[in-house]
């Protein structure tokens, strides 16, 4: 019985929510291991939509859900999201939700700094959600973060806040912002402490005990591997590691506990925010994909950029995340196109390459090299077996497998969880 890591294989928004929900019904424990409340997803269960951005998807199914130490937690958003779920009839208690005691907190100063940087008229715009994710990770690495466990120790909380503000107030002075008083941050923290502390735990211990007891653990990744701080399109990336290896570091469970890595892969490509996008389509096909695929961000509402499937970046992610198989999503969006293109390589300064360069300049200069396949006029929407798929659709899927070097384990043909074709069970050893 394998544990499963779910990772986005592109730039996020691949449809992880539906796949995670499908898998979470069979899992015993669901773990968030990186990111914050900057990447959202929607679950549709019995006609009811649940929009989550911080809490693990397993909560809506009553499964033990864990926020690992690799996540940055906005305590006020945490409380709001818990209350929203309760308002939809979901029972959220410490019996089903645990938060790592060593998870860093996002504070108001992080959100303000994030917004100020992104709104600046000078410098490089990354396209953040302005929710304080990046600045919170900066403080974690700088060893000045306030962590969840600090809320239990008033005697050490004040000096930690003082140290934090010594850094932030120097930044604020340089940006022409008013300095923040220690009491302001202390009040911000103490006002919410009683609502988050009942959920804290030694998550590494809880997960290890569950693993030894034979529980099936599902690691729920946020965003996509091409937004990874090391392996993504730097600097147009997020502030955490999003590749599958982070599941171990961000949960406290050793890497040998990771069994199967499932890469969620959209049948075309999208990206939100700034950064290179070799196969982007600024034409009627791009508009078609965006409109039919409802390509708008769950958290920000921002319109996503759309383009053809890029086998180069997915093949690279298969390697950097150790992907065993992919879940191919939104196949139905391609229905009706006369022809479909797949990027199989890039041209860089007159040379053919089979990888995405690390250099920002080179990433901007690469040109896609396409193969063109015939499309299909039949519908794939709602298909639940290979026999339901048009012959040309099957050829498209098989060609993707060949190009990326990984098999398709699951196929999604609509937002409904039942419209899923299972090829390989990720939980099966």
Curated annotation (Swiss-Prot):
It catalyses: IMP + L-aspartate + GTP = N(6)-(1,2-dicarboxyethyl)-AMP + GDP + phosphate + 2 H(+). It is found in: Cytoplasm. Mg(2+) binds at residues 13, 40. The active site is at 13 (proton acceptor), 41 (proton donor). GO terms for biological process: 'de novo' AMP biosynthetic process; IMP metabolic process. Its EC number is 6.3.4.4. The keyword Nucleotide-binding applies. Substrate binds at residues 298-304. Its main location: cytoplasm. IMP binds at residues 13-16, 38-41, 129, 143, 223, 238, 302. Pathway: Purine metabolism; AMP biosynthesis via de novo pathway; AMP from IMP: step 1/2. Its cofactor is Mg(2+). CDD domains: AdSS. GO terms for cellular component: cytoplasm. Belongs to the adenylosuccinate synthetase family. Homodimer. Plays an important role in the de novo pathway of purine nucleotide biosynthesis. Catalyzes the first committed step in the biosynthesis of AMP from IMP. This is Adenylosuccinate synthetase. It comes from Brucella suis (strain ATCC 23445 / NCTC 10510).
